């Protein structure tokens, strides 16, 4: 193995381990907290978490083996199943992010009617459509034998081995990425930009009230005035940072892989095998970033996982104290009657 291959294999191992740990922690938070389970967006986050977990235990290990052995690491049947799952899970995770953005849009733009517009039943219907949409493409690909081991990405994924099917495969690939990546990106941009517009409007209203208050309080201490102005600046940047993170991570992780898949269809451009695996690793990195972007760094999830960790540490400290006490009692000499 070359130094590049060793480095790429190490990256895949790190992505796999972090994705497993982070998504399992999100799942534990969901099971531990009744408040999180009551929230409608929790269904979308739960679906996204399961997609990321399945990706970490199915596609990532085979990609690691493909990098190491430079060949198909498993039998055709296993590779077909993993390729089917990879296509389904990637599409489902993209559409789950789009569904989360729609939920935020309804909550911010229509706050008074949110609970009537986004109920558990509505979320379940959206989730059902997500699964049907995600399953349709791998079913078509599997029926036409367009799933297999792709050496460029060292992965079991969409792949056409027959030259006579090239035109149909090009059309299928274009439609697939348009109705998965591009559709999700359009929904993300539309909804989050609407959310940002409303957030900025509310910030301006709060800023006007703050400035009027500061003008009236002429004897206010300069340090208090400075803190108010600093909070005003932070408020303006907070929504922009969050929305930039949502859209930015989506583009950064998925766009290189999607563009590479589309460019690959042209026989004119040569794509390096190293770049193919790098683009695949970037797509895998979404399974690592999603738990932090959508869950673990939010206040409610942060409080929950801290409670879980403290509970585990407290229990382990009690057990260790009990063991130490038993050991001490055993070492004491017996009392003579």
Model-predicted regions and their roles:
Residues 69-87, 116, 121-124, 131-182:
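Loop architecture of class A 7-transmembrane GPCRs
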Residues 97-102, 106-109, 142-151, 176-215, ...:
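Class A (rhodopsin-like) GPCR signature focused on the TM5-ICL3 interface and adjacent 7TM helical core
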Residues 201-241, 245, 299-337:
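Intrinsically disordered regulatory tails of 7TM GPCRs
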């Amino acid at each position: 193995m070359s130094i590049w291959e060793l480095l790429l294999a190490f990256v895949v191992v790190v992505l796999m381990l972090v994705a497993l740990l982070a998504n399992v922690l999100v799942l534990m938070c969901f099971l531990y907290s009744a408040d999180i389970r009551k929230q409608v967006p929790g269904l979308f986050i739960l679906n996204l978490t399961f997609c990321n977990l399945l990706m970490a235990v199915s596609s990532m290990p085979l990609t690691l083996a493909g990098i190491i052995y430079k060949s198909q690491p498993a039998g055709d049947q296993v590779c077909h199943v993993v390729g089917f799952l990879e296509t389904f899970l990637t599409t489902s995770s993209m559409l789950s992010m789009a569904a989360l953005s729609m939920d935020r849009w309804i909550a911010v733009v229509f706050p008074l009617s949110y609970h009537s517009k986004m109920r558990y039943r509505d979320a379940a219907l959206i989730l059902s459509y997500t699964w049907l949409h995600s399953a349709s493409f791998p079913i078509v690909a599997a029926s036409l034998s367009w799933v297999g081991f792709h050496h460029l990405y060292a992965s079991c994924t969409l792949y056409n081995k027959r030259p006579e099917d090239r035109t149909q495969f090009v059309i299928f690939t274009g439609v697939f990425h348009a109705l998965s990546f591009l559709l999700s990106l359009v929904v993300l941009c539309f909804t989050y930009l609407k959310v940002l517009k409303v957030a900025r409007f509310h910030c301006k209203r709060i800023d006007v009230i703050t400035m009027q208050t500061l003008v009236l309080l002429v004897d206010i201490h300069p340090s208090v005035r400075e803190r108010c102005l600093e909070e005003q600046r932070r408020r303006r940047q907070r929504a922009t940072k969050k929305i930039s993170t949502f859209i930015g991570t989506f583009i950064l992780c998925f766009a290189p892989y999607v563009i590479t898949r589309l460019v690959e269809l042209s026989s004119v451009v040569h794509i390096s095998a190293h770049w193919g695996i790098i683009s695949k690793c970037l797509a895998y990195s979404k399974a690592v970033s999603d738990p932090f972007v959508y869950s673990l760094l939010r206040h409610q999830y942060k409080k929950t996982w801290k409670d879980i960790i403290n509970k585990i540490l407290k229990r382990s400290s009690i057990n260790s104290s009990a063991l130490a006490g038993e050991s001490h009692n055993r070492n004491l000499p017996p009392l003579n009657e």
